[in-house]
Amino acid sequence: MDFHDKRNQNSYSGRNADSRWLTTIASHLSRKHIDIAADIGCGGGIYTRALAMIGIPHVIGVDSSAQMLADAKKACREFQQIELRKGDCEDLPLASESTDLLLARALIHHLPSVQPFFQEAARTLTRGGLFIIQNRTLDDCFLPGSTEHVRGYFFSAFPRLRKIEAKRRFSSAYVRQALHSNGFLLLHEETLWETRAIHPSKQELLVDLSKRKGRSILHQLSDQELAKLVHVIDTSLEQDGPIVEKDRWTLWIAEKQAER
């Protein structure tokens, strides 16, 4: 998926973060004093806005795509504490030891290696600052398809997508080792079922899938293949609605340690 293409505007905006996500993240921040947070790879600003809703005084959304930042600007216009900056995760537009919290949600699977990004995270975080990574492992991705886990049908309908997904997903062991080698202490790791959307009817889910909205993996399918996938999901889901679509994620909560 080309995140810079104007045809993909609003692909990663237009919804709110799940209440369970807000509660989970807030609980991990409860013992920390967070003045400045940065949402790296902020896309359309959904989680930039969520960090502000938690009560963080200053939130910086960073993305390399001007189109995504334009979407984020619209989504975050009511939040005075949000600032948006254009930049790459391997060369963050943040001063050294300037940030108390870095969030990287749905980012690292777009990277060939996490090492340059984790080095930048270590540079920009204050000592004791928190680094929250949210992404899917292969175990998360390849759960069977169901009414809630619609994504599972992608891989049963088109097994070649499994190979594409396998190339871009890092194992939990890899993430843990990369955190350790860059001076982070892993505080907590957990899986999180996050509600993606509540579709009033099956037809609305199928329309959403047809738009490929927020699902970069579907850009690997031709229009004809996408139509086939939509048909497979249509025939697989018996209930008409409402459909509560969820994704399972892995969360890694790490703390920057003092200089070794």
Model-derived features with residue positions:
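Class I SAM-dependent methyltransferase SAM/SAH-binding core
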Residues: 38, 44-91
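Short catalytic micro-motifs in class I SAM-dependent methyltransferases
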Residues: 106-107
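A conserved beta-strand element that flanks and buttresses the S-adenosyl-L-methionine
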Residues: 103
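Conserved class I S-adenosyl-L-methionine
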Residues: 1-32, 38, 46-50, 68-71, 132-158, ...
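Conserved Class I S-adenosyl-L-methionine
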Residues: 44, 169-173, 186-260
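A short glycine-rich, Lys/Arg-flanked "PGG" loop and its adjoining helix->strand segment in the class I
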Residues: 115-127
